[in-house]
Amino acid sequence: MKDNFSFAATSRNITSSRPFDNLNATGTNESAFNCSHKPSDKHLEAIPVLYYMIFVIGFAVNIVVVSLFCCQKGPKKVSSIYIFNLALADLLLLATLPLWATYYSYRYDWLFGPVMCKVFGSFLTLNMFASIFFITCMSVDRYQSVIYPFLSQRRNPWQASYVVPLVWCMACLSSLPTFYFRDVRTIEYLGVNACIMAFPPEKYAQWSAGIALMKNILGFIIPLIFIATCYFGIRKHLLKTNSYGKNRITRDQVLKMAAAVVLAFIICWLPFHVLTFLDALTWMGIINSCEVIAVIDLALPFAILLGFTNSCVNPFLYCFVGNRFQQKLRSVFRVPITWLQGKRETMSCRKGSSLREMDTFVS
């Protein structure tokens, strides 16, 4: 182990693949870790606290979503099924945060053994992809509801029963490299047993760059293309609709929600994927700047943290803003929800079919 590595570098191995052993193996990019920087790890002291905060808030709001779905009587809507699975993926992702908070608290010393390292590392990756994939499904579903309202009215819940297993299978496949390579390795210089991606030494750089680019493409670029295309298509369609009075208010609400969904996804995940892409470039030898590597090491823990906050935001974007959320909450818990009371605009029964379908955004 070379003596120029800092604690911060180990953070890449929570969702990334910077190695901490076998650094002299052939096939690696020596310039990526020949830097002499050793930034302070003082900033890591705040990470566990922030992880626990996200865990508590995110777990609470997603539990409410899951409870509403499980207690809902009658047939389930396609959009409700997607929201339930999104909340479930977020819950499972958030459930891993206490372990990673402990990992940070002990300066990357994994205390839970190699099996838990492999299982929870894979669990985190699987549900991260599942959450992003279900956000994409929600975007496509809402696009269909607004652009093709008559066809969407004929949708049956059983149609979602095909999509949901497919999404979970895709998430499982995306997490297979993590399940295969994640393991505990002793880092003598740091005096820790780190939970890392233990790629073959002779191909470490290639594997690290490949996995990083895979996460960029499957976890951000492709979903963002779908999400942005769907919501800008909705915006274009609704702006062509002549709406007045309450219909216009509803239309404006939908447009704001469309923008909020796109912005939330970008704000939460763009920093992580930019740093992951830069990390891939260092492994490929395209970037050899020690300053860039230092920035990646310093910023990545907070970028990962920001990505996890998306799991806290999702219930507010897809469930809590609904016109019927207060009524659903009352029917399930049978208590007055005075803190949720506010002005609710009732849509006209004579509005166009496209505007009727906009209720899928706020229901």
Curated annotation (Swiss-Prot):
Chief site of localization: membrane
Pfam families with a match to the protein in the record: 7tm_1
One GO process term, biological-process aspect: positive regulation of DNA-templated transcription
Tissue: Expressed at highest levels in adrenal gland and uterus.
Segments of this protein annotated with the region Helix VIII: 324-333
Annotated localization: Cell membrane
UniProt topological domain (Extracellular) ranges: 1-45, 105-114, 182-206, 282-294
Annotated glycosylation sites: N4, N13, N24, N29, N34
Gene Ontology annotations for the cellular component aspect, listed alphabetically: plasma membrane
Membrane topology: Multi-pass membrane protein
Cytoplasmic topological domain residue ranges: 71-80, 141-159, 233-257, 321-363
Domain comment in the entry: Helix VIII may act as a gatekeeper for either suppression or activation of the receptor, depending on post-translational modifications and interactions with various receptor partners. Helix VIII is found in a non-canonical position, stabilizing the active-like state, but at the same time preventing the recruitment of G-proteins or beta-arrestins. Upon switching to a membrane-bound conformation, helix VIII can support the recruitment of G proteins and beta-arrestins.
Function summary: Receptor for angiotensin II, a vasoconstricting peptide. Signals primarily via a non-canonical G-protein- and beta-arrestin independent pathways. Cooperates with MTUS1 to inhibit ERK2 activation and cell proliferation.
Protein family: Belongs to the G-protein coupled receptor 1 family.
Self-association and partners: Interacts with MTUS1.
Designated name of the protein: Type-2 angiotensin II receptor
Gene that encodes the chain: Agtr2
